[in-house]
């Protein structure tokens, strides 16, 4: 166990364009090797593509996508009597947001479009329409939790 005590969580500054902490978190997840300017330009270009394709406000599409990707339940491995059980647990709101952002970015990177801003825009549009790989990942996580419902009494 660490001896230096508890590290407090840093507060994220709101994004200057959309005035949203969620957008800043998405930029942080997109960022590679500390290149924040590159990550933010990818995100803003993706938001422009969303506005052109859907005609809707990009923040509305993004928030809807987030709500469709956030998991409610997940499974955690717990060792009981020499065997490991996948125990379904509820996901805390902060972790829901983190997982949703992580899945959106990772499945955007796996898409086949030409540039990253196109990939991200299309993944966000798909997620807002309840399709796409990130939503499928959430469904898989929920299916695992449902399949292991019998072990719910081993809660943490």
Curated annotation (Swiss-Prot):
GO (cellular component) term, any one: small ribosomal subunit
Signal peptide start and end residues: none
GO molecular function, one term: structural constituent of ribosome
Record key words, sorted: Ribonucleoprotein, Ribosomal protein, RNA-binding, rRNA-binding, tRNA-binding
Protein family membership: Belongs to the universal ribosomal protein uS7 family.
Function: One of the primary rRNA binding proteins, it binds directly to 16S rRNA where it nucleates assembly of the head domain of the 30S subunit. Is located at the subunit interface close to the decoding center, probably blocks exit of the E-site tRNA.
Name of this chain's protein: Small ribosomal subunit protein uS7
Lineage summary: Bacteria, Bacillati, Bacillota, Bacilli, Lactobacillales
């Amino acid at each position: 166990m660490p001896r230096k005590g508890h590290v407090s969580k840093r507060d994220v500054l709101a994004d200057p364009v959309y005035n949203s902490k969620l957008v800043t978190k998405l930029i942080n997840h997109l960022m590679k090797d500390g290149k924040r300017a590159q990550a933010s330009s990818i995100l803003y270009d993706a938001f422009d593509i969303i506005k052109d394709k859907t005609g809707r406000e990009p923040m509305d599409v993004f928030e809807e996508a987030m709500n469709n990707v956030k998991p409610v339940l997940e499974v955690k491995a717990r060792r009981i009597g020499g065997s490991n059980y996948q125990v379904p647990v509820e996901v805390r709101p902060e972790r829901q947001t983190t997982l949703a952002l992580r899945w959106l970015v990772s499945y955007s990177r796996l898409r086949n479009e030409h540039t990253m801003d196109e990939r991200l825009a299309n993944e966000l549009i798909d997620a807002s329409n309840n399709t796409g790989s990130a939503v499928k990942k959430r469904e898989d996580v929920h299916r695992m939790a449902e399949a292991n419902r019998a072990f719910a009494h081993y809660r943490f």
